[in-house]
Amino acid sequence: MAASTTAPKGSRQTADERRHTIVEAAAAEFSAAGLHGTSTHAIAKRAGISQPYIFQLFGSKQELFLAACSASFQRVRDAFAEAAAANPDNAREAMGTAYVQLLSDRESLLMMLHAFAASSDPVVREATRREFGDIIRLVERLLGSDPEDVRGFIAQGMLLNVSAALDLPGLAGEQAWAARMFEGTGVDCG
């Protein structure tokens, strides 16, 4: 059964805190079943709110999905910016390490993959393009604008996304091909 993300009894959340709680609950549900496989009833139950309240705050299930996706993409941007700021002389390696650490957050990882998968919807596609473009522009700014380097960094990240979603690190001990996917990436396959 899904855990509730409501505030402790006796405390009142601000509107921003309530929105954040609902987005977190939505991310947990959407990351498991995607946009079309998730019910607003399940999200409301997890958040400890009424289902109509979701629509009052977000307007539609799609808007809530986009808010949850945006939060996941923002985690990536924040991790890249923080890593590059902490190690400006070796920003690429620091950002790569930060991304590998993010992969342990399966919820965010799966939210991004569900955003890509739901992009047959024009509204989702446009929002996901915008989020992905923001990541690419940030990587260009942090690493320099060499297109080949940026493409390589993004491609490595996408390979890691798919590999982590398929739990290839857990398979690496049994399958040599899975282990080869992580050579030199810093991913712990042990």
Regions found by a protein language model. Name each.
Residues 1-7:
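Short, intrinsically disordered or compositionally biased N-terminal tails of bacterial proteins
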Residues 18-21, 25, 29-63:
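Helix-turn-helix
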Residues 25, 29-32, 78-83, 111, ...:
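Solvent-exposed, amphipathic alpha-helical segments
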Residues 65-72:
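Alpha-helical DNA-contacting segments of helix-turn-helix folds
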Residues 67, 78-108:
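Hydrophobic alpha-helical connector segments
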Residues 99, 112-116, 153-157:
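Short alpha-helical scaffolding segments that buttress acidic/His motifs in well-ordered protein cores
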Residues 103-122, 132:
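Amphipathic alpha-helical segments used for helix-helix packing
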Residues 122-133, 137-190:
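Hydrophobic/aromatic-rich alpha-helical bundle segments in the mid-to-C-terminal region
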